[in-house]
Amino acid sequence: MDACESIQETSTIMKARFHLIFMLILPCMAAAQLAPDIHPARFGALTLYFENDAFGSTDRDYTNGVRLSWTSPSLQRFSDDPTAGRVAGVFDDAPWFGDSSYERNVAISIGQSMFTPVDVRNPALVPSERPYAAWLYVGLGLVWKKTNVKNTLLFNIGVIGPWALGEESQRLVHDALGQRSPQGWDNQLRNEVGVNVTYERKWRLHHNPASSGMDWDFLPYVGATLGNVYTHGTLGGELRFGYNLPDDFGTGAISDSATTSTPLEGSTKAWAHRFGWHLFARAEGRAVARNIFLDGNTFRDSHSVDKKPFVADLSLGFAVNWRNSKLSYAYIYRTCEFKGQPDEQIFGSITLSIFF
C-alpha cells in the first residue's frame, strides 16, 4: 500500500468511526433534552466513556477503551445505596472514610480496554512490539467528599486474555467500519484473573461554588494503584477555565479511579438549570512498577516488552454542561511506555454523563 492509499484509508476509517460515535451519543443527548431540569447532586449519573486512537490517526498500542458506569446520588452512608449498598455498606464504620460531614457516592462500572502492536495485519508474533491484550472488568467505587476535597477507593476485578473478548470486539468494530480484520490475536496474553485496588485524593483550588460567569479552578490529585494488572503511583492536575463551571471535580479519561464526579448536595449552584462550558488542560505522571499489558502474564510465560518506569499523559479538551447532561472531549498525548516503542501515542476520549 502506497502513502496515498494509506492516507485515504485512514481518512475513511476516521469518518466511519466519527459517524459510529455520533450515532451512539445522539440518543443519549436526546434523552437529556427530554428530562426535566434537576440539581445533579440529588440524582444518580450514568456515564459513558469512549476512547480510541482513531482520533490520533493510528491503530496501535492502547487502541480502544469503553466504560459504562452508574454513580449514586449523594448519600449519608454507603449502605443507603439501593444498588450495591449491601457490599459497600461494610465500609461505613471504617474510620478512614471520614465522619458524618462527608457526602458519599457508590459507583458500579463495566469496561473493556484493548491493546495491539503496530501491524495488526501481521499474524506472527513480533518480539519487539507489545503483546495483543484485552482487559474486561467490573468495578465498585466508593467516593467520600467535601466542598474542596474528594477521595475515591476503587476495586476492579476482571479477566485478561481470550476471556476478555478483545479479538471478537475488535473484529466486530473493524467489520462494521469495513476494515480488514486483525490477524495476530492468536499471540495475545493468556487467560488470567485480574484484581486491582486504587485510591485517589483530589482537591479543588480557587473554587467558588456560588460563582457564575467566567471563572477558573485547579484540581490537583495524587493516587496509587496496586494489583496484578497495574501497580503505580500517580501525580497530576487539571486546570479548568470557562463559563459557569460545573460544581464538580472534573471528568477524567478512563483510568483506575474513573468514577463520575457528582456535585455536592449543599451546593448553591444548580448548574443543571443553565448552560455552561469550559476548556481544560490536564497533566498526569505515573511511576510504574507493573503493567501486565507490557510485562506479560503474572503466573506463566508470555510475550512481553521492557516497560519504561515513568509515563506521562498530557490532555487538552473542552466540556459542555446543559440541563442534566455533561459532554466532554479530550485529546490525549501519552509518552512512550516501553523501550523500542516507535512513537508516542495520541488518542481521543469522549465522556457523556446524564443525571437522572
Model-derived features: positions:
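Outer membrane beta-barrel transmembrane domains
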Residues: 45, 118-119, 238, 243-356
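Long, hydrophobic/aromatic-enriched structural stretches that serve as scaffold segments
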Residues: 90-166
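Sequence/structural signature of outer-membrane beta-barrel proteins
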Residues: 51-55, 115-119, 160-164, 204-208, ...
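Short glycine/proline- and aromatic-enriched beta-strand/turn motifs that initiate or cap beta-hairpins
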Residues: 33-78, 105-111, 115-120, 288-294
